[in-house]
Structure formats: C-alpha cells, structure tokens
C-alpha cells in the first residue's frame, strides 16, 4: 500500500493522475475510487484533465465508488427468484415485523409500529451495523437495546428466508479473502482520492485487496506536523486513518511534491490550523487589502440582495470571457435558498443546475393517493374530496374542468362533508349547475363509482386483493389513461424533463406495489392501512437528478464542496446557525453506546461516533471550502435569514480578526453610491430601475453619489429598450379600467337599471366593487357566523313573525317568541348544522334574540309607537309599497318595520346585526342611502301622511364587565341603556319620540322639514349620478379614503377594509391611494347643511 499526502492547498488529484497515467502505460486497468457524493463531478473533471480540457473516454480507467466494484469483477447471473427489497420494501418489512409483536414483548416501541420516522431510524440503524461489520448482538445490553435486538433479529430472519437482500460488497470482500479474483487483480491498480476516513466495511475491503493488486494507492490531505501532533490538528481524521493503516500492514508513506500555491488560501488555512491546535503564538497572519482579489466576506442586507449580487458578478465575468461552468454557488441552507435563487437567476438569464433533491410529493399522482388516504381516514372531508378531483388524475372520460369548479363551489357553499352526503344526490335546486354537478358526483363519487367500489367497505382484505382492487380503480377511474396522456403531452411539447418525472412517479408506484406484494401479499389489512403503507413509500420518494454536463452554474450544499472545485466560488447563506453545521444525534444509538461498542469489538468492527465524526467532518468541510476556489472565493452571510437577525459565524470572526477593512464588504440593494456593480443584464436593470428612481427622488444630491450614471442608464433604456418603454407607459395605468362597449351595456343594463338600495352604497364605496358583485354577480364563500347573511335572515324572520302575531302584548310576548323561535329553528337547522362554526353560532342566536326582544317588548307595550307593516317590500313583484324609481333606475328593497306614532306620523325601523348609526357625512358621500330611500318610499306610498324619521336597531347580546359594576342590580339598567334605537328624526316629531322608551336621540340627527327635503333630493342625486356613470360604461377602481385615517394597520384604505376582491383589482394603498381613491369626509356637518340650504354642491 502507498499513501500519498499533500496539504489541502495543493492539487492532490494532479499527483494521483500522474500515477494513473503511469499505470495505464503499463497496460494496467485503473480503478479510480472517489466518494459517492461527488462521483459524477470527479469523473468529469478527471476525464477533462486527461484530455486537457475536451471530452474524452479512457477505457482502461474507471472512476467509480467502493460499492460499484463488485459489478466489474463478478459477472455471475443472479439465480434467485426472490424479490430484492429496496428502502421502501425494507420499511414495509419492518412494519410487518413490528405488527407481529405483542405489547409486552416490545413495550417501548410497540406504539411506533406505524411511525414512518421510527421505521426510517430502524433502516438507518441496520445500514450502520452493516457498514460497521456489526450484528445486533454487538449492541450494549439495556432494556431499549433488548427490544431492538428482538426487532432486528426477527427482521434479519425473515429477510434471509424470503428475500434476496444481502450485502454484495460484503460478499465480494469475503470472496476476495478466499482468493476467487486473484487472477483478475494481477494487472489492476486501485487509486483512492478524497477520503479522510473509511467505514469498517471499507477498511476490511482495503485490507483484503491491497496485497492482491498490482498497485494500491491512497491519496489524502495532511502535513508532516499532523502525522505527529495527535488530535491537535486540522487533519485529525486523516492522521488517525494513516496511523491505523501503518499499524495494520506495510505502508509506503510519501508526500507529493509541491506545486504553485495561492498565498491567500494558504493564509486562511494557516489561520484555521493555529486555531485548531489551541496554541498561543506571536505569529500574526494578516489579510491585506490586495487579498480582496482572491477572498472576500460579504454581509448582505437579506437573501435576495445576496443572491442578486452573485448574479450581477457572474454576468459581469461572463462579459469578460468566463463561462457559466466556471462558477459554483454553495448554499448554507439549500431548501431556504431554492425558490429565491431560481427566481433571481432566471431574471439574470443565468443557466444553472440546482443539486437539491426534489420530492415527488407535489406530483398529481401522489396528491391523488394522499387525498384518497385522507378521504378514508377523515370520512370525506370537503377539502380532501376537492383535492382528489383537482389532482385531475381520477376523472370521468369526458369530464370538463369547468364542472370541477362548479362542484367545488357547490360543496364549499353548502358545506357538503361526510360519505353519506357525497354519495346521495345534491338537492340545492337553486344552484344553476346542479345537474352537471350531480352527474359528475354520481360518476366519480356515487355508490357505483370506481372510488366507492374501492373504498366502499371497511372489511379487511389480503394485500394481493387490495392491489387487485387498486388496479381496478386505476383503470376504471382513468388514472392510467390520464398518466399516459400527461406523459405524451409533455413529450409532444418537448418538455422531456416533465415527461421523465411522470414516468419516474409511475415507475415508483409500480415498484412500491411490487414490494408491497412481496411483504404483505397474504396479510389482512383495512383500506386505510393499505393506503398508509402505500403512501409512505410514495410521498418520501425523490426524483432522480440528471447532473448538468453543459455550460451552467452549479449550485449545491456547501457540505458537498471539495478542494479546487472551480475558478469562482460563492458560498452564501453561511450564518452562525449553519456554518459549521451542528448536527444532533437523532439515531437509535447514543454517542455513549457507540463508544461502548467500539471499546468491546474486534479490530475490523467499529461504528461511527457521531459527535467525534461530525466535529472532524465540519472541520474538514471548512478547510475544503476555503481551498475550493482557484481564482476567487466569497463567503457571505445575510443580515436577515428566515425572519431572524443573522450573526457572524465563528469562522468569519476568525478571518476578520486581522483582516483589512476591504475584506468585509457590506452588500446592499441598489443605491446611488454604487454603479457598475449593479449592472447584470438589461432585464435586471429594468427590474431595479424603479428603486433607483425612488432613491433619486427621495435623497439629497451629494458629491459622492452616482446619480449622473444612473440618469444616463435610465435615458439609454428609454431610448433603446422597447420593453422598458412599454413598462413606463403602463406604470401609470397598471390598474386603470376600460369603459364598457355600448353593445355590452345594452346586454347587461338595457334601458333600465334594476338594483337594490344596498348595491348603490357599494357603488359609492368603490365603483369596481359594484361592477364585480352586482353587474357580474361575483360571490364569495360565506361561512356562517354572527355577521353572515343567513344569520341576518334568521333574525329578520323571527322578528317579522313575532311582530305579525295577532293579539300581541307585553304579557304574551315571551310565549309567542318561544313558539316562533321553535318554528324558525326548524327552517334554518340545515344551515346551522353544516360545521362547528355554524353550530356555535346557532347556540348563541337565542340569547341575542331574547336580549334584542326586550326592546321590541317595550315597543309593543307602548301606545305611542305601533307597527303597521313588517318586512314590507318595494320594487319587487306584489310589493306592499309599490315601485320606486329615480329616472331609469328601479330600486328594490325591504323595510323591516313601518311604524306609526300616535299622531299618525310614519317612519321606518331597520334591523342590523352590526353597529349602525345615521351620519350626515356618510349620507352626503353616498355611503348611507338606505334611510333616506326608505323614507322617500314611505312618502311616495303614503303621500297624505307626515314622516317622523327612521331608526336602527342592532341585534346583540351585550357583554358586561362585572368588575365595572358595584351591584348586580345595575345589570338590568346597563343592558337597557345598551339596547336602544338610533337614527334620524324630523323636528316636528322629535318631542314625541323623546318620550318613547329605548330610543336614543342625538341633537345632531334632528332635522327640520326643509333639511329633510334637501336630504331626499341629495339622495336621489346620488342615484342619478351613479346611473349616468353606469350607462356610460364608466367603472373606476376608486375605493373611498379619508385623509385623516390614511392607511390602516392591515395596509388598506377605508373602502378596501372589508372587500374580498383585492386580488382581482390589485389595488395597493401605498401605490394607488393618491391616483385611484375617492376622498370623503372633507366637510363638516355645518358646511353640509349650509350647502343643502342653497349653495352649489361640489361634485
């Protein structure tokens, strides 16, 4: 055995390739072994080096991995008919083994038999024992491990009897010892590159083969000091490995001759070396200003700014002649950076390969199985059924996608949930597409549907029967047909990567089912157990990655780095929390147990002590990272990461201790003090020019800023870039609406506009809201709570029926109210039993009704105010109050109560489920039209009677803070004060109204006859103005805004506060407020009244 070592600042691979070429000249077969995590990149690098930069093939040199070696020497056909289980199958077998134990046999682990996490830990433990050349008997003796021994022993017994699983690598090692391959190995050279430690399994293989080959070479990183310094070294793992090999067999140890070294990276290595030795020295290693060319540390504002600066530098170096393949981006948290990096690199037109395994969990087929499992487990929850259908895998042959939308709308609106409701006919006949929805429901969810045939009963079946039944679902439910269609469509559109994904997922399903049959074929299972086992194999599966072999930027986890990786290295997202990465031992064996195993086992048996191994690995990873660049290295940390303040890693602090200030660079978003650093490509400059423009406007000019540069860039873009010109033209119109065409107006309105009173209040809140909700009839899903329409209708119906009762008096009021409540409850029960929120609301309704009814009871008992009509309508067929129109606008509505004073004055009572009061300002701005319209309708219907006004009555169950009262007797008065009518009253009737109990009268809401008439005219003017705009087809996005309120905490102006349609109009208060909102509340009450009395009103 030869062990060649060199310092990590040197090129180890260059020295090993010289040996490989020597051996090839001797006509020897060379096996060049590299770590599995970098085998593809290393093979590509080695072949390019041998061919001096161009692609080539060298038939007698194979870059490979330890576990692949048996394939090259053992060409025997496997003569077994047994199934070989993969990771999914092993998990299934462990599950079956666990299910075979009784609770008293494995009390600690019995409850974890279906835990995916525990099954994964068992697979991991078994794999560790194999690579450590250990068996279950080597586990320390304690109650936990006694259970693990039982589980693993039974598992191995069943595996060896029923399946073809065995360690090919271990078997190959045993056959090497027996001399089976001696003849083949005579002209073989084995070279090992990049290892700093080996597993027990690998060491046993090395011991078995190293004397049988022509030449056996191990190349690694170390220095003379480390070979004698023991543990106090940056090469501690390597020195331990070399010492172990030298003690076991003859070793020729030599150092590879020095080549040219980058002094900056040598300094960084020396800093780490001194730190790892814990020595106090007078040696001062400084990073100077000129070292910035080779090494920088960035402190970026945030992740996006950090990635953008990487992208800008890549684009600039490309212009200078570099290739994309010359760049490697290493990330501290691959999952956290994936989305942002892809977006930024796409913007900067940088091709890249992101070496992050992608889960299959988002594929439609996996979503289908997840939904299928959830449907059975949770008894057909609404969302689970909708997700199943929206996966578009399980469909009817001629299913229109629009029908799925109708179906979703129906089941969400009517809260359809539970198997019974989905298998029975939908009955809400007022739903316009009920026939289409029912047809789809019957075919896909009905009692004879493929889904119900598969899931319909809860009987246990054998595994093979479940697989057979699933095949029927896949065929009859068009799952197979749809998967084939997805694959063909992707191929047809040249989306070969997507087509490959479809194929991989389908193959994974077939493989999982085959392994399921191998393990559970004769086991009896319920459907939910079958789906759970199946899903465990699918949702954790990953797509195979095809490494990039073209001119692209490579992006990967920084832990996969190796020395001399590339010319330019950007290691980003390196914070205190992940650099170095601290890993906790989450296996079934503690560090103490691992130490005990290693102290009691034979020479070629040892298991990794994770606390020690992780420390050594972290140390070597940092060492590899700072030596990974050939020309330029950047280490970067964002100040904000995952919404938390980032802190410098100890490694950063170590390098910065004696570094020039130029080494640490603050990376900001675009600003006026930098120029060319921010130029990447034209698309990215266009994307950030808005920020630059804002900076130009908001900041004061200084002698140091680059505003002249940015103004020039702006002018160049305006003149030469058509895309930028279009953006500029569209900026001011990004939410501008287009007037409706005359023929469209004719179709939607005709000669007359028919609308409700409340809809015009919506018009004055925002014209676009009116257009969407009233013209286009868009509806939002309504959950039944205290503010929903259903609850409002419930209250109205209760009080309408009570107030219509004959012979109603204060004495029998409560009795009649109880009877009415019972009757109305029956009518509304289907709404209030839809879900938990609805049931909770229902439980509170009676309290609210009875509390509000105290006011009505007082009204019934007085002779001063009598109810003439309840729920009297206008503008509807057979309306009690007739029709009401303003020019060509025909209004409809319903007045909750028409009440008459003893003096024959008429007025309106309006019930509300939320707090309301009459405000002159809102009537002036068009936001409060109901009261004045109701009074206008009454005046028209009863021309010979005078009007007293209109009042609101809120339905509520007033809460009382008991800490604020002195005696319980005060509660009745407090409730009485809180339950009052409020509104506007005419001056002539004010005195009489004041004398009626439970009416709160404000001086500001008492109006004389002249003011009342002016208010009626103003109200009609609002309708006319709105009608004219509608008939001209004008629709503006103009939510109301009160200047004194501005933008609230949720980022809305007043008109958008409760609007559910913002995703359609895209109104953003901070951008559009000044141009697109309608300002209200600009006049005082005195000014409004003065204007009503004769002055011209501003429109």
From Swiss-Prot:
InterPro entries on file: ADDB_N, DNA_helicase_suRexB, P-loop_NTPase, PDDEXK-like_dom_sf, PDDEXK_AddAB-type
Kindly list the cofactors needed: Mg(2+); [4Fe-4S] cluster
Positions binding [4Fe-4S] cluster in this chain are 766, 1056, 1059, 1065
Keyword DNA damage among record annotations: yes
Enzyme Commission number: 3.1.-.-
Matching Gene3D superfamilies = 3.90.320.10, P-loop containing nucleotide triphosphate hydrolases (3.40.50.300)
UniProt keyword annotation of Hydrolase present: yes
Q: Which UniProt keywords apply?
A: 4Fe-4S, ATP-binding, DNA damage, DNA repair, DNA-binding, Exonuclease, Helicase, Hydrolase, Iron, Iron-sulfur, Metal-binding, Nuclease, Nucleotide-binding
GO BP annotations listed:
double-strand break repair via homologous recombination
Q: What class of enzyme is it?
A: hydrolase
GO MF term set: 4 iron, 4 sulfur cluster binding; 5'-3' exonuclease activity; ATP binding; double-stranded DNA binding; helicase activity; hydrolase activity, acting on acid anhydrides; metal ion binding
Please name the Pfam families in this protein's record: ADDB_N, PDDEXK_1
Q: What remark does the entry make about the cofactor?
A: Binds 1 [4Fe-4S] cluster.
The entry's function note states: The heterodimer acts both as an ATP-dependent DNA helicase and an ATP-dependent, dual-direction single-stranded exonuclease. Recognizes the L.lactis chi site (5'-GCGCGTG-3'), which stimulates homologous recombination. This subunit has 5'->3' exonuclease activity. The heterodimer acts as both an ATP-dependent DNA helicase and an ATP-dependent, dual-direction single-stranded exonuclease. Recognizes the chi site generating a DNA molecule suitable for the initiation of homologous recombination. This subunit has 5' -> 3' nuclease activity but not helicase activity.
What is noted besides the main data?
Answer: Despite having helicase-like domains, this subunit does not have helicase activity.
Q: How does it assemble?
A: Heterodimer of RexA (AddA) and RexB.
Q: Which family does it belong to?
A: Belongs to the helicase family. AddB/RexB type 2 subfamily.
Classification via HAMAP family: AddB_type2 (MF_01453)
Name recorded for this polypeptide:
Exonuclease/helicase subunit RexB
Q: Which organism is it from?
A: Lactococcus lactis subsp. cremoris (strain MG1363)
Q: What is the lineage of its organism?
A: Bacteria, Bacillati, Bacillota, Bacilli, Lactobacillales
Q: Which gene name does the record give?
A: rexB
């Amino acid at each position: 055995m030869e062990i060649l070592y060199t310092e990590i600042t040197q090129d180890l691979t260059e020295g090993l390739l010289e040996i490989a070429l020597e051996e090839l000249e001797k006509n020897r077969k060379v096996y060049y072994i590299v770590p599995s995590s970098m085998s593809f990149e290393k093979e590509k690098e080695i072949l390019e080096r041998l061919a001096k930069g161009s692609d080539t093939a060298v038939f007698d040199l194979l870059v490979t991995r330890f576990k692949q070696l048996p394939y090259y020497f053992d060409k025997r056909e496997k003569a077994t008919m047994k199934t070989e289980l993969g990771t999914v199958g092993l998990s299934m077998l462990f599950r079956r083994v666990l299910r075979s134990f009784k609770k008293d046999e494995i009390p600690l682990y019995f409850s974890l038999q279906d835990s995916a996490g525990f099954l994964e830990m068992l697979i991991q433990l078994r794999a560790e024992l194999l690579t450590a050349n250990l068996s279950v008997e080597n586990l320390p003796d304690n109650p936990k491990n006694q259970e693990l021994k039982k589980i693993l022993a039974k598992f191995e017994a069943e595996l060896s009897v029923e399946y073809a699983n065995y360690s090919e690598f271990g078997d190959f090692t045993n056959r090497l010892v027996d001399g089976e391959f001696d003849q083949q190995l005579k002209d073989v050279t084995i070279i090992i590159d990049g290892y700093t430690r080996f597993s027990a399994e690998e060491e046993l293989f090395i011991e078995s083969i190293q004397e049988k080959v022509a030449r056996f070479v191990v190349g690694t990183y170390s220095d003379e000091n480390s070979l004698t310094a023991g543990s106090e070294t940056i090469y501690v793992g390597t020195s331990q490995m070399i010492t172990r090999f030298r003690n076991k067999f003859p070793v020729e140890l030599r150092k590879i001759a020095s080549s040219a070294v980058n002094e900056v990276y040598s300094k960084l290595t020396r800093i780490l070396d001194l730190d790892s030795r814990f020595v106090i020295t007078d040696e001062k290693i400084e990073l100077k200003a000129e070292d910035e060319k080779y090494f920088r540390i960035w402190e970026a504002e945030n992740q996006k700014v950090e990635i953008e600066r990487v992208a800008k530098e890549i684009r600039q170096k490309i212009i200078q002649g570099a290739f994309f393949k010359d760049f490697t981006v290493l990330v501290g948290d691959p999952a956290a950076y994936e989305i942002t990096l892809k977006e930024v690199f796409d913007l900067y037109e940088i091709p890249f390969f992101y070496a992050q395994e992608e889960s299959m969990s988002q594929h439609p087929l996996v979503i289908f199985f997840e939904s299928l499992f959830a449907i059975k487990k949770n008894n057909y929850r609404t969302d689970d059924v909708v997700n199943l259908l929206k996966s578009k895998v399980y469909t009817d042959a001629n299913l229109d996608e629009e029908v799925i939308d109708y179906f979703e709308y129906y089941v969400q609106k009517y809260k359809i949930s539970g198997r019974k409701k989905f298998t029975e006919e939908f009955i809400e006949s007022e739903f316009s597409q009920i026939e289409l929805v029912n047809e789809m429901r019957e075919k896909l969810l009905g009692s004879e549907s493929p889904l119900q045939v598969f899931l319909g009963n809860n009987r246990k079946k054998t595994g093979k029967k479940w697989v057979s039944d699933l095949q029927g679902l896949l065929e009859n439910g068009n799952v197979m047909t749809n998967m084939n269609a997805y694959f063909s469509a992707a191929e047809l559109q040249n989306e070969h990567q997507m087509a490959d994904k479809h194929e991989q997922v389908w193959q994974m399903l077939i493989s999982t089912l085959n392994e399921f049959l191998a393990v559970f074929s004769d086991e009896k299972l319920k459907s939910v157990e079958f789906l759970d086992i199946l899903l465990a194999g699918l949702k954790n599966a990953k797509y195979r990655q095809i490494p990039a072999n073209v001119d692209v930027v490579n992006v990967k986890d920084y832990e996969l780095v190796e020395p001399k990786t590339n010319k330019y290295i950007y290691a980003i997202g390196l914070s205190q929390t992940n650099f170095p990465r601290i890993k906790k031992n989450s296996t079934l064996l503690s560090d103490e147990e691992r130490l005990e195993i290693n102290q009691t086992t034979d020479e070629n048996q040892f298991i990794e002590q994770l606390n020690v191994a992780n420390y050594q690995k972290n140390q070597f990873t940092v060492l590899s990272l700072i030596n990974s660049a050939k020309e330029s290295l950047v280490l970067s940390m964002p100040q904000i990461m995952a919404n938390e303040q980032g802190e410098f890693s100890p490694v950063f602090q170590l390098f910065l201790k004696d570094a020039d200030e130029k080494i640490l660079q603050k990376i900001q978003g675009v600003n006026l003090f930098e120029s060319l650093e921010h130029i990447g490509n034209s698309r990215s400059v266009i994307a950030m020019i808005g920020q630059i423009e804002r900076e130009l406007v908001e900041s004061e000019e200084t002698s140091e800023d680059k505003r002249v540069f940015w103004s020039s860039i702006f002018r160049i873009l305006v003149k030469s870039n058509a895309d930028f010109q279009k953006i500029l033209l569209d900026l001011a119109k990004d939410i501008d609406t287009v007037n409706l065409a005359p023929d469209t107006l004719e179709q939607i309105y005709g000669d007359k506009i028919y609308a409700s009173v409340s809809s015009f209040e919506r018009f004055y809140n925002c014209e676009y809201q009116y257009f969407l909700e009233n013209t286009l009839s868009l509806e939002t899903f309504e959950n039944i709570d205290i503010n929903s329409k259903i609850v409002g209708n419930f209250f109205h119906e209760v009080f309408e029926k009570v107030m219509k009762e004959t012979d109603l008096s204060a004495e029998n009021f409560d009795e009649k109210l109880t009877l009415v409540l019972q009757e109305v409850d029956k009518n509304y029960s289907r709404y209030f039993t839809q879900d938990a929120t609805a049931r909770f609301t229902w439980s509170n309704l009676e309290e609210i009704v009875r509390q509000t009814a105290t006011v009505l009871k007082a009204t019934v008992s007085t002779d001063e105010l009598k109810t003439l009509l309840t729920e009297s309508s206008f503008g509807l067929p057979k309306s009690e109050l007739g029709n009401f129109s303003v020019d060509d606008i025909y209004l409809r509505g319903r007045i909750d109560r028409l009440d008459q004073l003893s003096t024959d004055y008429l007025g309106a009572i309006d019930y509300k489920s939320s707090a309301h009061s009459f405000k002159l300002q809102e009537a002036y701005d068009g936001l409060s039209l109901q009261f004045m319209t109701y009074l206008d309708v009454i005046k028209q219907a009863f021309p010979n009677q005078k009007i007293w006004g209109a009042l609101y009555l809120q339905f509520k169950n007033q809460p009382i803070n008991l800490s604020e009262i002195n005696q319980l007797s005060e509660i009745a008065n407090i409730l009485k004060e809180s339950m009052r009518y409020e509104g506007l009253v005419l001056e002539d009737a004010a005195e009489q109204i004041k004398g009626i109990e439970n009416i709160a009268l404000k001086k500001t809401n008492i109006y004389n006859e002249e003011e009342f008439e002016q208010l009626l005219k103003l109200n009609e003017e609002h309708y006319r103005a709105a009608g004219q705009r509608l008939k001209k087809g004008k629709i503006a996005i103009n939510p109301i805004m009160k200047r004194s309120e501005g933008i609230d905490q949720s980022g809305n102006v007043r008109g958008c506060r409760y609007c559910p349609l913002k995703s359609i109009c895209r109104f953003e208060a901070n951008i559009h407020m000044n141009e697109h909102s309608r300002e209200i509340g600009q006049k005082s009450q005195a000014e409004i009244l003065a204007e009503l009395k004769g002055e011209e009103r501003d429109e």
